[in-house]
Design a protein with these regions (language model features):
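Pyridoxal 5′-phosphate
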Residues: 1-4, 8-257
């Protein structure tokens, strides 16, 4: 079904102005064909935005190749500071947009009759900028570029394949989301153990997972669960980390079941 993934026809009408999709699910790890989806949206005359917060840290991204009108990323998911993000936009689109807030350095001229605004991106960056966060985010992005995004992707693809094999057959464990095109994000449930209780045991074993809805409660419920645990890979994850999860889960099963 991955090959058929696209925007449903009924979701695109002549009234559609903007289509926003995620590049990679932070719950399921599913990687979406955003280039194809962008073409669909543009055929209907709509703008196209990619939420790449989960996507951009795991593989190369070329906004010109994707032909997206907007692309958003966060700082903390790119190994950078919290409280900052980036919105890429095609300049011709940004030029048509009014500022959403006012403040210093985003105004060109002010008179009693009218105000003119600076060209993008300055018109969207009102007030004192988050200079420290911006410098930190820039260094984080430079670090990933030096490592090479293709190298990071190859490393994580190997871990993802290994985890599918190792975790997919664990007794009493269900992996949530099994798309072929998948990144290093694994949500899972263990029969008879609440994810929060499981996380407590895993934490004692030196394994950090997140539990809950992962800011996507409708999706988690659509998959048939109230809450799930999630293990994610990064550029620092190694095979030994993947191998550490099964015995830790077995310890939790012995404790609670």
């Amino acid at each position: 079904r991955q090959r058929q993934m696209c925007i449903r026809d009924r979701a695109l009408t002549p009234r559609t102005k903007l289509v926003a999709v995620t590049g990679m699910s932070n719950v399921l790890g599913t990687i979406f064909p955003v280039k194809r989806m962008a073409a669909q949206a543009h055929r209907q005359g709509a703008l196209f935005l990619v939420d790449a917060c989960q996507y951009i840290v795991h593989q190369p991204v070329d906004v010109q190749d994707l032909d997206c009108d907007f692309l958003a990323i966060s700082g903390h998911k790119t190994y950078g500071p919290t409280g900052i993000g980036v919105l890429y936009g095609k300049y011709k689109v940004l030029e048509t947009m009014p500022p959403y807030q006012c403040g210093g350095d985003m105004v060109d001229t002010v008179t009693y009759d009218k105000t003119t605004f600076m060209p993008p991106p300055a018109r969207f960056e009102a007030g004192t900028p988050a200079s420290v966060q911006a410098i930190g985010l820039g260094e984080a992005l430079n670090y990933m570029q030096k490592l090479g995004m293709n190298n990071i992707k190859a490393h994580e693809d190997g871990l993802t394949a290994y985890a599918r094999e190792l975790w997919g057959s664990l007794p009493g464990v269900t992996l949530v989301g099994t798309a072929k095109e998948k990144g290093g994000v694994f949500s899972f449930v263990v029969d008879g153990i609440h994810p929060q209780d499981l996380a407590f045991v895993l934490d004692k074993e030196g394994i950090a997972v997140r539990t809950g809805h992962h800011c996507a409660e409708p999706l988690v419920h659509r998959m048939g669960y109230e809450t799930v645990a999630r293990a994610s890979f990064g550029l620092y994850t190694v095979r030994e980390d993947v191998e550490a999860l099964p015995p830790a889960i077995r310890k939790a099963q012995k404790m609670f079941l």
